[in-house]
Amino acid sequence: MSAGGAPVPPPPNPAMSFPAPRVTLPAGPDILRTYSGAFVCLEIVFGGLVWILVASSNVPLPLLQGWVMFVSVTAFVCSLLFLGVFLSGVVTQINANWNFLDFAYHFTVFVFYFGAFLLEAATTSLHDLRCNRTMTVQPLLSDNQYNINVAATIFAFVTTACYGCSLGLALRRWRP
């Protein structure tokens, strides 16, 4: 009771004062049973292969392949975090429009990965370019580096396609 004799109302329940998060993807391990969860897993696997292959080629053209490494490693880590947020169920506790965040994330990564794929393809196409190093003409990429870069280009394309499929699914969820 207050000093005036009127009863004091109970404090509001915080669970009732916050709106529910907007997400149509399931939380927990059920995310892995959806197409979106499967694509995120493929993005992680193929994206990891891209940066491992680029790193194993000893990065002969750092100006081009440095961006490919940055994009592939950043997307790999962010996709792991994205999947971890859904697997842990945090999406049900944070009030956010997760459908829009899913769309915005996949749109951004798709654009950057498409650029990285083009740069990796450009690097691979320089295989026959010869450079003059003190009177000895050598190819810019050795045969081993060329083969590794071909594989990295293929996996960069596959990863870009996976991000594109995830983008399409996210767009359908965000704009029904």
Swiss-Prot record:
Membrane topology according to the record: Multi-pass membrane protein
Entry-listed glycosylation sites: 132
Domain of life (superkingdom): Eukaryota
One of the protein's GO biological processes: myelination
InterPro entries: MAL, Marvel, MARVEL-CKLF_proteins
Residue ranges of the TM segments: 35-55, 67-87, 103-123, 150-170
Major localization listed first in the record, in broad terms: membrane
Cytoplasmic topological domain: 1-34, 88-102, 171-176
Compartment annotation: Cell membrane; Apical cell membrane
A Pfam family: MARVEL
Annotated ranges, domain MARVEL: 31-175
Keywords attached to this entry: Cell membrane, Glycoprotein, Membrane, Transmembrane, Transmembrane helix
GO molecular function terms attached to this record: structural constituent of myelin sheath
Topology Lumenal: residue spans: 56-66, 124-149
GO cellular component, one term: membrane
Entry's family note: Belongs to the MAL family.
Function comment: Member of the machinery of polarized transport. Required for the indirect transcytotic route at the step of the egress of the transcytosing cargo from perinuclear endosomes in order for it to travel to the apical surface via a raft-dependent pathway.
Subunit structure comment from the entry: Interacts with TPD52L2.
UniProt-recorded name of the protein: Protein MAL2
Native organism taxonomy: Eukaryota, Metazoa, Chordata, Craniata, Vertebrata
